[in-house]
């Protein structure tokens, strides 16, 4: 409850509105777009609480990990856990600007662009986003590079439908588009510039406490795709967090190139990172057509080339991707419940 109470106080100070996150958790209230600010506070509080429980009852500290990474708000949580900033320093700018993001989200939808065969031509998709935006029917941008065959786009108004129609006419028939019906805050896209969110955030970040020491463990950033944080550049990196797309695939590649063998997923209901690694593992397993990596042979290589050319390209230059099916995944929320200690 300590972390939820602290997060509630930070929320109240930043928004001048009272919230009781402890009550919300006890009542198991669902979050929504309208309660986006509360969700931000809740997620970071739950992350901190889980890590505190892991340390207090099991003697396992965050700093025992070889490295950390997080998608979107998860990277903010990683910087807090790695003692670069206190929670208030990073949450306050986000909470102060969250209202603008929610207002922008009212006419924003997400599109998933994916391929069942070839690697996506990302520059062509980026170009189509620019072309569609120039038609003055709303801004559309890539918000995340999920994999060589998948990107997420966020678009305003009619831009999503215009993008879909043009994509269907211009791209390979193996390139598909799926529209998500929910509304999404346009974080990690240029859309937030319409409310000057990046500039306002950067001004706030200039004077927040902290940020003048390196993380206690290396953090692979979804902003840069590598371990780029040092003892003074976190503010500059975080400026780009606001309006630049997430480089999730670069992070996955980098993580698999290290010596990690277990991934501990921190926070409430983690989804995109486990899902991305699970899809990669299934793709590799189905092509290897064997019970272990030792079954990888010429026939498997041939099959990969024929059925998943995007995967073949990346395996040829980055064999470490083959480690994906061997990783052990621990959902910390579930693990803590399964190993609860009586007090």
What are the functions of these language-model segments?
Residues 284-307:
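Conserved phosphate-binding/catalytic loops in two-lobed NTP-binding clefts
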Residues 271-283:
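Short Gly/Thr/Asp-enriched flexible loops that form oxyanion-binding sites at enzyme active sites
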Residues 174-274, 302-339:
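Acyltransferase
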Residues 48, 52, 78-79, 274:
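Short, hydrophobic alpha-helix immediately C-terminal to the catalytic nucleophile
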Residues 1-69, 153:
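Helix-rich "cap/lid" substructures immediately adjacent to catalytic or cofactor-binding pockets
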Residues 66-74, 78, 82:
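Gly/Ala-rich beta-loop-alpha elbow adjacent to hydrolase catalytic centers
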Residues 66-70, 152, 261-267:
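Short glycine-rich phosphate-binding loop at a beta-alpha junction
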Residues 81-233:
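Alpha/beta catalytic cores of group-transfer enzymes, especially the acyltransferase/condensing modules
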